[in-house]
C-alpha cells in the first residue's frame, strides 16, 4: 500500500506541483461538490504542502461545511496572505459574528459579498440586496440573490439568477413554489432529488418543498408518497 501511495505522490509531483490540483479543486468547489473538492485539495497539499491556492480553498470548503476549527487551522498556515482578511471574515460569519464583519469595512468584490452576507444574517435584506446586485454571478452570489428575493417576498425575481447546481435547483424550486408556479417547482424538485444523497440535508429540503408542491396541486397521492419518503429521513410529528 505504501508503494502505491508513493507512486501516486510521484505522479502528482511530475504532473504539476499542486497547481493542477488547485484548478481541479476550484472547479469542484464551484460546482458545490465539497467532499470531492476537499479530497482533491488534500491530495494537492501532499504534493505541494504550502500551495496557497489550495490552502485558501480548504478554508472555504471547511467553512461551507460548518467546520470552523479545521478552517482556522488552514487559515493559520496562510499567514499574511492577501486573501487572509477575507477568509477571516468568513470565519466570523460562520461563528455568527456578523457585526464584526461589517466593522472590518472590507472593500472590493469579495468585501462587498461578505458585507452583503452579514447584512442578510442581520435581517437587513434591502441593504444586502443593494450590495449583492452587480457582483459577478458565481454560485455563492446566485444563491445569495435567490435567498434574498425569497426572504423579501419577491420569489420570482430570484429565479433567473440561479444555475443548475443541486443547491441552486432546490432553491429555484422553493422560489417557484413561493411564486405559485407549482407544476414547475414539482418538476424541478422531482428531478434534483435523484441527484442527492438521502443523507444530505439538501435532500430533505428538496423533499419538504416537493411535499408542498404536490399538495398545492391537489395531488394527494403524490404528496403522501413524498411525505412518506421524508418521514424515512427526518422525524416528523405525528408520523412514525
Segments the model singles out, each with a brief description of its role:
Residues 2-8:
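Sec-dependent signal peptide recognition
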Residues 30-31, 64-65, 94, 121, ...:
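Register position in tetratricopeptide repeats
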Amino acid at each position: 500500500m505504501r508503494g502505491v501511495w508513493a507512486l501516486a505522490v510521484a505522479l502528482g509531483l511530475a504532473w504539476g506541483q499542486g497547481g493542477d490540483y488547485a484548478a481541479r479543486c476550484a472547479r469542484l468547489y464551484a460546482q458545490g461538490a465539497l467532499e470531492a473538492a476537499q479530497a482533491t485539495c488534500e491530495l494537492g497539499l501532499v504534493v505541494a504542502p504550502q500551495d496557497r491556492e489550495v490552502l485558501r480553498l480548504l478554508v472555504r470548503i471547511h467553512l461551507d461545511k460548518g467546520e470552523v476549527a479545521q478552517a482556522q487551522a488552514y487559515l493559520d498556515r496562510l499567514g499574511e496572505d492577501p486573501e487572509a482578511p477575507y477568509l477571516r471574515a468568513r470565519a466570523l460569519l460562520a461563528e455568527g459574528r456578523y457585526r464584526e464583519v461589517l466593522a472590518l469595512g472590507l472593500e472590493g468584490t469579495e468585501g462587498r459579498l461578505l458585507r452583503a452576507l452579514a447584512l442578510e444574517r442581520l435581517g437587513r435584506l434591502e441593504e444586502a440586496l443593494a450590495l449583492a446586485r452587480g457582483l459577478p454571478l458565481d454560485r455563492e452570489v446566485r444563491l445569495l440573490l435567490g435567498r434574498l428575493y425569497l426572504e423579501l417576498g419577491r420569489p420570482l425575481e430570484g429565479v433567473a439568477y440561479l444555475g443548475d447546481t443541486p443547491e441552486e435547483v432546490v432553491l429555484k424550486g422553493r422560489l417557484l413554489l413561493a411564486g405559485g408556479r407549482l407544476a414547475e417547482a414539482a418538476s424541478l424538485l422531482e428531478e434534483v432529488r435523484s441527484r442527492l444523497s438521502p443523507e444530505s440535508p439538501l435532500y430533505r429540503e428538496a423533499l419538504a418543498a416537493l411535499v408542498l408542491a404536490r399538495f398545492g396541486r391537489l395531488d394527494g397521492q403524490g404528496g403522501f408518497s413524498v411525505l412518506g419518503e421524508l418521514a424515512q429521513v427526518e422525524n416528523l410529528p405525528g408520523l412514525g
